[in-house]
């Protein structure tokens, strides 16, 4: 059996610092600036986010977060192919009341679900917590119609706008708006593109406990629609599914479904199905509608207010409830500002989420934004409500 490979916290810190210094030096050397500009790309951002959380009893908790991302890319091209290497780190510092009352936060930050242990934490809940991870560390090569990659990467098989039942390797929770890059997995991927535009992709990933996911995806275009079918194994389940993306008149129309087959216990087999439609309105405004069916989700009355915010999605369980419906509306104003309003309703549980946001470009590479995640509903004829507000400043480099 393969054993998980780990790094000590000190080695990770040193490795992160070394690569940051290399990236800085490469871009700073004037005598070979053209070479480094051609083959290397360094970028990232620094964010500060203040969070306030409140409940029906009037209790309010705060949390402050400093968030840094550093991305380093190397590329070398030949006549018919090329090579690319990516190293990306995510570093966060938390402090505040919400950190002090969460005794599991430090363990959560240091937990790495990949085969390589590339995450670590430091600090104390009574003062501050630091969490660092390399969520991208991978190599990509390509030659003519072939492409291959190895390492911690994002394999995106999702085609639906909101819920991705086909995304076997990197399912994400849509309420985690502060993680735009989304998680990666330790995987090997090989892709072949055919002359008619069709493509075949095979991928396999391994987790911290040596559990594996392996599948193949075939994609093609016909009738102005993109279609795909997938088949493989998702941990202990065999899977088969597919998806589409096209349009009906002026509406975009997307969907995907996956059937998870448990050969040992048929009661644990599950179906995940999602559809969505998008429409562009006048004045650069956007309207979106989506629905999700999860056969193993909750269908009766239940208090899901807390679990919605901490829910860890998987393609087999994208939401904790059996049925979910979503409506989104967004647009721009003043040329430098944008807004969005997202509403999610969970039939049966009598709960819903309301997530408004507004973003303002203050200067080049500097944005300010305000977000809210409000969860409300009824349990035993009693109202339940949780409010979370986020103020965020982001500087990109």
Model-derived regions: residue spans:
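Residues that define the transmembrane beta-barrel architecture of outer-membrane proteins
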Residues: 38, 62-70, 130-135, 142, ...
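Outer membrane beta-barrel
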Residues: 79-198
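Outer-membrane beta-barrel "beta-signal"
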Residues: 360, 367, 371-374, 384-397
């Amino acid at each position: 059996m393969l054993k998980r490979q780990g790094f000590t916290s000190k080695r990770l810190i040193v490795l992160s610092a070394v690569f940051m210094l290399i990236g800085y030096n490469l871009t700073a050397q004037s005598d070979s600036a053209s070479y480094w500009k051609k083959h290397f790309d360094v970028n990232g951002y620094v964010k500060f986010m203040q969070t306030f959380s409140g409940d029906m009893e009037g209790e309010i908790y705060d949390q402050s977060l400093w968030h840094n991302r550093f991305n380093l890319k190397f590329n070398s091209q030949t006549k018919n192919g090329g090579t690319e290497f990516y190293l990306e780190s995510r570093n966060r510092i938390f402090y505040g009341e919400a950190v002090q009352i969460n005794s599991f936060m430090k363990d959560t930050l240091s937990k790495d679900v990949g085969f390589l242990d590339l995450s670590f934490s430091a600090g104390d809940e009574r003062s501050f917590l630091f969490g660092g991870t390399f969520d991208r560390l991978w190599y990509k090569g390509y030659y003519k119609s072939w492409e291959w990659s190895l390492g911690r990467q994002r394999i995106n098989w999702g085609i639906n706008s909101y819920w991705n039942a086909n995304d076997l390797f990197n399912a994400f929770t849509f309420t985690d708006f502060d993680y735009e890059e989304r998680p990666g997995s330790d995987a090997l991927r090989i892709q072949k593109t055919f002359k008619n535009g069709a493509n075949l992709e095979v991928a396999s990933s391994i987790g911290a406990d040596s559990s594996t996911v392996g599948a193949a995806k075939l994609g093609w275009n016909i009738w102005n629609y993109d279609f795909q079918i997938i088949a493989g194994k998702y941990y202990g389940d065999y899977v088969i599914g597919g998806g589409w993306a096209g349009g009906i008149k002026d509406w975009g129309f997307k969907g995907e479904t996956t059937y998870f087959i448990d050969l040992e216990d048929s009661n644990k087999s599950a179906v995940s199905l999602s559809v969505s439609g998008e429409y562009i309105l006048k004045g650069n405004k956007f309207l979106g509608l989506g629905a999700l069916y999860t056969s193993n989700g909750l269908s009766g009355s239940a208090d899901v207010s807390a679990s919605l915010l901490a829910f860890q999605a998987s393609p087999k369980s994208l939401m904790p409830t059996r049925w979910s419906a979503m409506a989104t509306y967004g647009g721009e104003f003043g040329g430098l500002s944008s807004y969005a309003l997202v509403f999610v309703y969970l039939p049966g549980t009598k709960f819903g989420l309301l997530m408004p946001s507004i973003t303002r470009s203050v200067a080049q590479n500097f944005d300010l934004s305000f977000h809210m995640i409000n969860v409300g509903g009824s349990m035993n004829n009693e109202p339940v409500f949780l409010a979370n507000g986020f103020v965020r400043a982001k500087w990109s480099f």
